[in-house]
């Protein structure tokens, strides 16, 4: 993914304003609610029977935190996302057999949560930059599938 220096600065500056743990928990929760077929990867998380159950599930929140911290680590390697996510790509491809389309879906949820949390700071320029980032991360995570 190619981001200009201005876009990189915008992304890193805005990322410093968010509660990453909350973003991760909400984004994963929204993914599981809006696209319920993704729940099959998380059946061991217990009660996912309703939107409320998903959004309040401690295992969903904990995994969302783990996911978003990996995403945040990737923000430090915007010029080499494939390298940064190589081992996670291999894990999700070879062991977990996650449909790579799910990475795009989760990226969309991250954008939605960021938009809500950042409000007017999430300008069209910021949204564009974050869309590039989540697309790059999704592509990097899908890399081992090819």
Curated annotation (Swiss-Prot):
One of its GO terms (biological process) is hydrogen peroxide catabolic process. The modification S-nitrosocysteine is found at residue 93. The modification N6-acetyllysine is found at residues 82, 144. Keywords: Acetylation, Heme, Iron, Metal-binding, Oxygen transport, S-nitrosylation, Transport. Red blood cells. Residues 2-146 form the Globin domain. PANTHER family: HEMOGLOBIN FAMILY MEMBER, HEMOGLOBIN SUBUNIT BETA. Involved in oxygen transport from the lung to the various peripheral tissues. This is Hemoglobin subunit beta. It comes from Mesocricetus brandti (Brandt's hamster). The lineage of its organism: Eukaryota, Metazoa, Chordata, Craniata, Vertebrata. The gene is HBB.
């Amino acid at each position: 993914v190619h981001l200009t220096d201005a876009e990189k600065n915008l992304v890193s500056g805005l990322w410093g304003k968010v509660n990453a743990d909350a973003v991760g928990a909400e984004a994963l929760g929204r993914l599981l609610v809006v696209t319920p077929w993704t729940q099959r990867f998380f059946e061991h998380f217990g009660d996912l029977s309703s939107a409320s159950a998903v959004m309040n599930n401690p295992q969903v929140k904990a995994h969302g935190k783990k996911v978003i911290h990996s995403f945040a680590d990737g923000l430090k390697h915007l010029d080499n996302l494939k390298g940064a996510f190589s081992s996670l790509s291999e894990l999700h491809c070879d062991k977990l057999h996650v449909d790579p389309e799910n990475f795009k879906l989760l990226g969309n949820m991250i954008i939605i949560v960021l938009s809500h949390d950042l409000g007017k700071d999430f300008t069209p320029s910021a949204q564009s930059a974050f869309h590039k980032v989540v697309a790059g991360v999704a592509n990097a995570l899908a890399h081992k599938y090819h």
